[in-house]
C-alpha cells in the first residue's frame, strides 16, 4: 500500500495531502449555502473563507507529518501511506519552516476575511480569537510537548472546528446573524468529519498504539470503533431529517443520495481486514461528505 516517494516535489505534494481539502471545504460550502438560503450570500466571504480553510488544513497536515515523526507514530511499522519526513526527502527543519509559512498565510488570509466581513471591533476580536484557536489546534494535534491528538481528543476538535465553528462561523460572516436551524447542519458536518478522522485512526490503530497515541480506536478497540463509525454516519443523516421536517425544505433530502455512498463506506470499513483495505475508505468518506453538502445546497436553493 505504501507508495514510494522518489522526488522532493512528490514529498511536498504528499505532505500537503490534497485529498483532505474537500472535507475542509465542506463546512465552508455548507455555511455559504445556508447564507444563500437566507438571501445574504457574499462571494468574497466564500472565497476568503475557503482560502483560509485550505491554508489551515495544509498547516494541520504538515504539522501532523512533523509531529508523528517526532513522536514515533510514523515509523517503518506504520501501515498508512508514507509521510514526507518519513521518506527522508524532507528534513524536520524544512517541515517546520513550511509550518511557519502556512501559519502566517492562515493568519493573513483570516485577517483579510475579517476586515471584509465585520466592522464591529468586538466581533473582530472574537473571530480573531477563534482563528488563532484554529491555528493552535492545527499545530498541536500531533506536535508539541503535549499533543492533544495523542490523548484521544482529536474527535472533539474535528467536531468543533469542521462542524460547529466551520458552518456557524461561515454563516455568521455572510449574514452577521444567527439562525438556529444552521446548528443542525453544523452537527451533521461535525459527525461526518469525525467519521473521516475515525476511519484514519482505525487504519493506523496498530502503529498508533505502539507509539502511545491514544486515539479513540486505540482506546475502545477496532470493533467498537467500527460501531462508533456507524453512529457518526447515521447521526449526521438523522440531523438532516430533523432540518428537513422542521424547515419544510423537502428538496434537501436530495442529500440522501450521498448517504447511500456513506453506507458503502461504512460497510467497507467493517469488512476491511487490514490497513491497506481501510485506507481507500478515508477518501471515499471525505468525498461523500462534500457531495452530501453540495446536494443539500442544491435542494435548499431550488
Locate the predicted segments by residue:
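Intramembrane alpha-helical segments
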Residues: 5, 81-180
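Small-residue-rich segments of transmembrane alpha-helices in multi-pass membrane proteins
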Residues: 24-30, 156-171, 217-222, 283-296
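Membrane-embedded alpha-helical segments that form the functional core of polytopic membrane enzymes
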Residues: 30, 39-63, 126-139, 179-199
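Acidic (Asp/Glu-rich) catalytic motifs at the cytosolic membrane interface
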Residues: 55-79, 194-217
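Functional transmembrane core segments of multi-pass inner-membrane proteins
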Residues: 158-205, 223-226
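Extended hydrophobic alpha-helices typical of membrane-associated regions
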Residues: 245-302
Amino acid at each position: 500500500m505504501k507508495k514510494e516517494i522518489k522526488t522532493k516535489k512528490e514529498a511536498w505534494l504528499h505532505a500537503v495531502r490534497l485529498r483532505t481539502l474537500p472535507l475542509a471545504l465542506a463546512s465552508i460550502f455548507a455555511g455559504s449555502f445556508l447564507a444563500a438560503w437566507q438571501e445574504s450570500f457574499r462571494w468574497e466571504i466564500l472565497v476568503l473563507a475557503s482560502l483560509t480553510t485550505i491554508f489551515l488544513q495544509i498547516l494541520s497536515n504538515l504539522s501532523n507529518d512533523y509531529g508523528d515523526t517526532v513522536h514515533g507514530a510514523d515509523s517503518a511499522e506504520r501501515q498508512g501511506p508514507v509521510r514526507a519526513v518519513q521518506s527522508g526527502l524532507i528534513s524536520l527543519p524544512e517541515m517546520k519552516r513550511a509550518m511557519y509559512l502556512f501559519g502566517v498565510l492562515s493568519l493573513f488570509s483570516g485577517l483579510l476575511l475579517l476586515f471584509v466581513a465585520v466592522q464591529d471591533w468586538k466581533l473582530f476580536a472574537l473571530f480573531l480569537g477563534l482563528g488563532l484557536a484554529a491555528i493552535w489546534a492545527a499545530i498541536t494535534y500531533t506536535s508539541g510537548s503535549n499533543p492533544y491528538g495523542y490523548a484521544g481528543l482529536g474527535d472533539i476538535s474535528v467536531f468543533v472546528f469542521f462542524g460547529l465553528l466551520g458552518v456557524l462561523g461561515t454563516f455568521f460572516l455572510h449574514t452577521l446573524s444567527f439562525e438556529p436551524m444552521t446548528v443542525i447542519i453544523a452537527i451533521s458536518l461535525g459527525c461526518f468529519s469525525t467519521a473521516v478522522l475515525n476511519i484514519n485512526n482505525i487504519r493506523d490503530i496498530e502503529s498508533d498504539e505502539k507509539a502511545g497515541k491514544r486515539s479513540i480506536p486505540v482506546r475502545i478497540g477496532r470493533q467498537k470503533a467500527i460501531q462508533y463509525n456507524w453512529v457518526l454516519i447515521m447521526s449526521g443523516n438523522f440531523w438532516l431529517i430533523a432540518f428537513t421536517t422542521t424547515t419544510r425544505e423537502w428538496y434537501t433530502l436530495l442529500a440522501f443520495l450521498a448517504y447511500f455512498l456513506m453506507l458503502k463506506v461504512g460497510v467497507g470499513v467493517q469488512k476491511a481486514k487490514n490497513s491497506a483495505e481501510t485506507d481507500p475508505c478515508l477518501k471515499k468518506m471525505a468525498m461523500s461528505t462534500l457531495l452530501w453538502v453540495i446536494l443539500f445546497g442544491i435542494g435548499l436553493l431550488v
